[in-house]
Amino acid sequence: EMGAILAEIRDLGFDREGYLVHEPTRRRIDVVYERVDEDILYAELPELIDCHVEGKVHVLFAPNSEVVDDKGVEVFVPEMIRTYLGEEPLIKNAQTWSLAVPEERRYVMERFGELVVKSRGGYGGKDVMIGPEESRESIERFRRVVERNPTEYVAQELIDFSTHVLCEAREGSVVFRDSYADYRVIALAPDPKDPNVVEIVPGPLTRVAVPGKHVVNISSGGKMKDTWVLEN
């Protein structure tokens, strides 16, 4: 429906004028929505940088934008807003401690089993320990991993976030249960001449966790579901 091309890196190339093209169809590509590691993308398509700089293609995740995905950066975002924008943050961060900071590391290690400890570079719910949900043995095992390289980890308070009622069919009957849910609002800017015009899609991307767990990532057992906002 979008007319978008699903392509692998090997399907991409450049024409004589330096524009990115889809080799099988020779269609020029205007926008790249990358779902691979940027190091791999630019290593295999080094010309993409120049193409991007010259305005011949737009890349949804520009080079090095992954720095904002680093959970270690999140700790310092409120102070970055104050320093570089001269403003107070409008939305508060979840309380987060960086194990790269000695005082914060000591605090986290003293309360290790009470907190959520996660790798800065982890994704998909991997390399995360939710202390209150783990056994003592699992907590101690994860503690030893963290102690080997503490600067690569951050810790947060466990947030008891929203739940959503799920309807499941089991052996001919219907079962309702609560599950922790993560809602991702989709905001669109439809007017290229006025970036202040923003429309919110009335249905957030919703991920739900395995019963009794907080991790909603699909790769860690979570599921997707539909959610629709019927009224403002």
Predicted feature descriptions by range:
Residues 1-232:
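Domain-scale recognition of functional cores that engage charged ligands
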